[in-house]
């Protein structure tokens, strides 16, 4: 079918009276392996479909670039067209391996491809977003109308016919320009026997220059504009993210640290303390250097219950009394201690009972211990975990421990997002 639509297909068919290239070109559906790709040079051979360089056929196998997104299959398969139509069988009788169209030698035995099957894997036909994509016959480019000459941009104008181009396909242009505004429609061909087409207006005689940065996609995909950090708005149908990672998104909420708050002075206990004061600690000074914890517990436990500390596992005494005797760097007692009651009222009354009390020749002094600033709540680093909110595994924030004395692991915390088998 070298003359589909009165075109000159394979080698040497006469020029038809309709003007050279007309609508089809090189071979119609079967002849010349060129699809509708325009003026097939030497039919089925190397530069199939007068396009080669961007139009109807890649470089000789039936399919070739033409239209579609980036020549045939968006650049993925070179100019081999869609499918397996250009595959060739190894000429070696003992081999018989079927090779891909783009190979120039047998993948199995290394024999050279027979003449007429060389594929231009590097001439993919300009790609871009095309109305006219040559090669619709055998799974060709994903173009539009298959007019093969009526594309949006003819890359070359060399007197006779335009290459079955694609939008933005230059001659031997690898990656056609993505995302450019379509120019005005090409002029209707004049059937005056000459087969010539006027050059497209507004684009000159040369191919479209390649884009300076490969940051755009087809117009319908809306690729990111400006790489990874920009906030430029994206254009197009599917709406690519503007600016890549975190581009244009709201900044992460900054948690105010506890130190950022104005440190207000903690009110200390004095003679005006009422029943609402929760300070249960007393400070004892001028103690004898050999004082023991049991002595202080027996003495001060006469007016109230001395508090206990729930110790971690492994200690001999799991519930020691909450009494701290201070020592110096060498471990010697300094003569002062701190004791905590269970009831704050007992602590407030301890000074009236034991201040200036004489213990082995030393008059001890008993005052209310200073209240320290409240501790910052310990938020979990996961920011709320499974239950959201502030910290902790189930939200709610705050300290999830069972008391305020580092009481060991919380059995309800489960160690994060670990799965529980039972």
UniProtKB/Swiss-Prot annotation:
Residues 134-156, 252-263 have a biased composition (Basic and acidic residues). Its main location: nucleus. Residues 8-24, 47-83, 123-133, 219-229, 236-247, 382-397 have a biased composition (Gly residues). It comes from the Eukaryota. It is found in: Nucleus. Residues 280-371 form the RRM domain. InterPro entries: Nucleotide-bd_a/b_plait_sf, RBD_domain_sf, RRM_dom, Znf_RanBP2, Znf_RanBP2_sf. It holds the Pfam family Zn_ribbon_RanBP. A zinc finger (RanBP2-type) spans 84-115. Belongs to the TAF15 family. TAFs are components of the transcription factor IID (TFIID) complex that is essential for mediating regulation of RNA polymerase transcription. This is Transcription initiation factor TFIID subunit 15b. It comes from Arabidopsis thaliana.
């Amino acid at each position: 079918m070298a003359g589909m639509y009165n075109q000159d297909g394979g080698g040497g068919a006469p020029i038809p009276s309709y003007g050279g290239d007309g609508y089809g070109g090189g071979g119609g559906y079967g002849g010349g392996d060129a699809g509708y790709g325009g003026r097939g040079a030497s039919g089925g051979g190397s530069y199939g479909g007068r396009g080669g360089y961007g139009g109807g056929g890649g470089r000789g196998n039936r399919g070739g670039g033409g239209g579609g997104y980036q020549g045939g299959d968006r650049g993925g398969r070179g100019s081999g067209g869609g499918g397996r139509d250009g595959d060739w069988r190894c000429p070696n009788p003992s081999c018989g391996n079927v090779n891909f169209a783009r190979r120039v030698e047998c993948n199995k035995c290394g024999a050279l491809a027979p003449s007429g099957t060389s594929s231009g894997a590097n001439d993919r036909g300009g790609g871009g977003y095309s109305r006219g994509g040559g090669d619709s016959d055998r799974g060709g480019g994903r173009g539009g109308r298959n007019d093969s000459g009526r594309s949006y941009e003819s890359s070359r104008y060399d007197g006779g016919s335009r290459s079955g181009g694609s939008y933005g396909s230059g001659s031997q242009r690898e990656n056609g320009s993505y995302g450019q505004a379509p120019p005005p429609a090409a002029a209707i061909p004049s059937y005056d026997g000459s087969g010539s087409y006027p050059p497209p207006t507004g684009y000159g005689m040369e191919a479209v220059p390649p884009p300076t940065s490969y940051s755009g996609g087809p117009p319908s995909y809306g690729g990111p504009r400006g790489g990874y950090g920009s906030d430029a708005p994206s254009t197009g149908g599917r709406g690519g993210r503007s600016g890549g990672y975190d581009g244009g998104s709201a900044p992460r909420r900054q948690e105010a640290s506890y130190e950022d708050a104005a440190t207000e002075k903690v009110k200390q206990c004095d003679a005006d303390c009422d029943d609402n004061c929760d300070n249960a600690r007393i400070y004892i000074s001028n103690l004898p250097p050999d004082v023991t914890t049991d002595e202080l517990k027996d003495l001060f436990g006469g007016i109230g219950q001395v508090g206990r500390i729930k110790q971690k596992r492994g200690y001999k005494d799991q519930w020691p009394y909450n009494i701290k005797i201070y020592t110096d760097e060498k471990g010697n007692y300094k003569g002062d201690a701190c004791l905590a009651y269970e009831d704050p009222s007992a602590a407030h009354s301890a000074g009236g009972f034991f201040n200036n009390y004489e213990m082995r020749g030393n008059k001890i002094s008993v005052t209310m211990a200073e209240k320290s600033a409240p501790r910052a709540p310990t938020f979990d680093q996961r920011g709320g975990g499974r239950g959201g909110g502030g910290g902790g595994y189930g939200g709610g924030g705050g300290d999830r421990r069972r008391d305020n004395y580092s009481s060991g692991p919380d059995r309800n915390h489960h160690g994060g997002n670990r799965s529980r088998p039972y």
